[in-house]
Amino acid sequence: MKTLYSLRRFYHVETLFNGTLALAGRDQETTGFAWWAGNARLINLSGKLLGAHVAHAGLIVFWAGAMNLFEVAHFVPEKPMYEQGLILLPHLATLGWGVGPGGEVIDTFPYFVSGVLHLISSAVLGFGGIYHALLGPETLEESFPFFGYVWKDRNKMTTILGIHLILLGIGAFLLVLKALDFGGVYDTWAPGGGDVRKIANLTLSPSLIFGYLLKSPFGGEGWIVSVDDLEDLIGGHVWLGSICILGGIWHILTKPFAWARRAFVWSGEAYLSYSLGALSIFGFTACCFVWFNNTAYPSEFYGPTGPEASQAQAFTFLVRDQRLGANVGSAQGPTGLGKYLMRSPTGEVIFGGETMRFWDLRAPWLEPLRGPNGLDLNRLKKDIQPWQERRSAEYMTHAPLGSLNSVGGVATEINAVNYVSPRSWLATSHFVLGFFFFIGHLWHAGRARAAAAGFEKGIDRDFEPVLSMTPLN
C-alpha cells in the first residue's frame, strides 16, 4: 500500500484494520486517513465536509425535537418539573412559554409546538446533509466560490469567523426580543413567588454590565454567575449581541494583521483546537451558572441550588420551632453559636448551624425577610408568608444531590425525595464535557503546532507488529 509523501508529511497516517473497507469512496490511500478517522477524510473536500456538518446539525435538532415531545408525553402537571427528570421543558418554561404565576404550568401546547418545529427542521437538515454528503459537489471552490475555502487562506477564514459571530449576535438578540416584546420571560423574583413578565428597563450601563466580569469568582462576589436580576441579564445580551455583530462585521471587512498572522497556526486542525478551547470555557462557565444561579435557571423548574436547599432546611425548622415557642433570636446551638440565627463575619444576621457556610445565598422566597443588616428578627416573627413556608419545605426535601444510579436527596433528611435534580445533571454534564473538550483542545493544538513546525511524522509503521498479522477479513 503506497501512501503519498505529501500525506505522510502533513497528516499522521493510521494503519488500516481492514484495507478493503472504504466508506463513501473515501479510503486511506486517497485521504491519508482510515475510515474510523471520520471527517478527517474530508479535510480537503469542502462539499463533503459541508454535508457532514449539516447532517450533524440535523441529528442535534432531531434529538431536541424527539426528546422535547418525549418529555411532553410524560409530563405530569401536578408535579414540579424538577421531580420528573425533565431537562428540556425547564428551558422552555424559563423563556416564559406555558407557565403562569409561581411557575405553574398552565399550557403544554407551546412545548408540543416546539418539539414538532424541531422535528420538521431536522428533516430539512437531514435531507441537506445526505444531499451534500452523497450527491453534491465534492468541493465548493469551483462551483460556489463564496462557500468554498482553503484552510490556509487567512482572509477567508476570518470572513467565516465574522459570519459565525454575526449569527451568534442575532441569537443573543432573539432572547432580547422575546423578553421585551414577545410575551416576556419567567422572572423568579416577581412579587409573590415568580411570574412571566416583559422586561422594560434594561440595564445598559457599561460599568454595571462589565463590572460583573471584573468581580471576584469567589464567595458572594461570584463573577458573572452572580447576576440576580433579569434587567441585567437581558441587558448583558444586548451588549453581547452588539459586540458579536460588530466584531463579525469587522472580521468580514478586514484582513488579519501581521501580528495575528504570526501568532496563530492557520490550518484546519488549529481551528478545531481553538473551537474546542472556546467550547471548554463555555462548558465550565455553564456548569457554574446552572449550579449556583437561580435567576437564569429558576428553582421552580430546575429545583433549588445546593445552598438554597440548605438554607431552606434552616428556615423550615426555624418556622417550626418558633411556632413551638422557641426564642429563635437567642437560642444557643451545641457549639455555643446561635442555633437558628447568628452573625456573619461582616456582621449581618444569618441562619445558624451548618448552613452558615451558605450565608451569601440570595433567593426570592428569603429576600423579603431581610433588613439592612441581614435577616430581620421582627420580620421572621411576624411577616413569614405561607408561600415562603411551602416553598422552603419543598426545596429542603429536594436538594440537588444525587448519583448516576438516581439515588438522590440528602442522606440525613428523612423526608427527602429520591430523585436526581436537573441541576445535578446539567452541572455535571457540562463540567465533564468542558473537561473533555479541554483535553481535545490540547490534543489538536499539539498536533497542529507539530504539523506547522514540520515534525509531525506519527509512529514509524515499518516494524509495527500488526503489519505481520493476518488481515481481519
Curated annotation (Swiss-Prot):
[CaMn4O5] cluster binds at E367. SUPFAM superfamilies: Photosystem II antenna protein-like. Residues 1-14 form a propeptide. It is found in: Plastid membrane. The chain crosses the membrane at residues 69-93, 134-155, 178-200, 255-275, 291-312, 447-471. One of its GO terms (molecular function) is chlorophyll binding. Binds multiple chlorophylls and provides some of the ligands for the Ca-4Mn-5O cluster of the oxygen-evolving complex. It may also provide a ligand for a Cl- that is required for oxygen evolution. PSII binds additional chlorophylls, carotenoids and specific lipids. The modification N-acetylthreonine is found at T15. It comes from the Eukaryota. GO terms for biological process: photosynthetic electron transport in photosystem II. Gene3D superfamilies: photosystem ii from thermosynechococcus elongatus. Pfam families: PSII. One of its GO terms (cellular component) is thylakoid membrane. Keywords: Acetylation, Chlorophyll, Chromophore, Manganese, Membrane, Metal-binding, Phosphoprotein, Photosynthesis, Photosystem II, Plastid, Transmembrane, Transmembrane helix. The modification Phosphothreonine is found at T15. It is a multi-pass membrane protein. One of the components of the core complex of photosystem II (PSII). It binds chlorophyll and helps catalyze the primary light-induced photochemical processes of PSII. PSII is a light-driven water:plastoquinone oxidoreductase, using light energy to abstract electrons from H(2)O, generating O(2) and a proton gradient subsequently used for ATP formation. Belongs to the PsbB/PsbC family. PsbC subfamily. PSII is composed of 1 copy each of membrane proteins PsbA, PsbB, PsbC, PsbD, PsbE, PsbF, PsbH, PsbI, PsbJ, PsbK, PsbL, PsbM, PsbT, PsbX, PsbY, PsbZ, Psb30/Ycf12, at least 3 peripheral proteins of the oxygen-evolving complex and a large number of cofactors. It forms dimeric complexes. This is Photosystem II CP43 reaction center protein. The gene is psbC.
